[in-house]
């Protein structure tokens, strides 16, 4: 919940979602949690905070979160407005990506699968307002640049840890969601 600075868990019971306050994750005021994803094995959770512009890494066990790392999504020297938006893991779980509106970039991180911690590899600048993106076949990132009215294609070479902006783009009014059928 962005305004309440918490992640709320729900239980599904006979067609009804019920909030489970015993498992609410409270984060620092002003963080603005946006999206959370889990490692493939379920041991780690990655929370992107849109206001604090950071990623919080948690060890996860039986509904409990233990913070093990917090890392910025944009360079510390960046002085403009930025708001972290989407977060994705590759199917291998070896790399994590975050989009940053304002800084207009995709940040690429290496994931240590033993500790769950991440380390920044580099950032690729995109069009304006990369609100959402998705990974296609672990070879491409399709980025919806809302403020430039385009979908951009980035090429991803996982074995060599390379992410490059390609020449391919498609005009599309204010893309806000990149959904992929699996």
Model-found features: residue ranges?
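Structural signal for beta-propeller blades
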Residues: 5-7, 53-55, 104-106, 149-151
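Short loop/turn segments immediately following beta-strands, especially the blade-tip
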Residues: 10-17, 58-66, 109-116, 154-162
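Beta-propeller fold detector
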Residues: 18-25, 66-73, 118-125, 163-171
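Oxyanion-binding "anion nests"
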Residues: 48-96
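C-terminal hydrophobic structural anchor segments
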Residues: 107-155
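Blade-level signature of beta-propeller repeat domains, shared across WD40, Kelch, NHL, RCC1
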Residues: 146-155, 164-182
């Amino acid at each position: 919940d962005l305004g309440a600075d918490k992640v709320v868990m729900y239980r599904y019971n006979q067609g009804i979602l019920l909030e489970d306050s015993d498992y609410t994750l409270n984060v620092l005021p002003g963080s603005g949690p946006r999206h959370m994803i889990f490692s493939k094995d379920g041991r780690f959770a990655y929370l992107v905070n849109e206001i604090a512009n950071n990623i919080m890494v948690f060890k996860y066990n039986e509904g409990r979160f233990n913070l093990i790392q917090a890392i910025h999504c944009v360079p510390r020297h960046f002085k403009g407005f930025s708001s972290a938006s989407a977060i994705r893991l590759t199917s291998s779980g070896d790399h994590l990506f975050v989009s940053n509106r304002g800084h207009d970039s995709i940040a690429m991180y290496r994931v240590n699968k033993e500790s769950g911690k991440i380390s920044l590899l580099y950032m690729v600048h995109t069009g304006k307002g990369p609100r959402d993106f998705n990974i296609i076949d672990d070879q491409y990132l399709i980025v919806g640049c809302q403020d430039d009215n385009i979908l951009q294609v980035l090429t991803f070479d996982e074995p060599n840890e390379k992410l490059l902006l390609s020449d391919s783009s498609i005009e599309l009014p204010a893309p806000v969601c990149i959904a992929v059928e699996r």
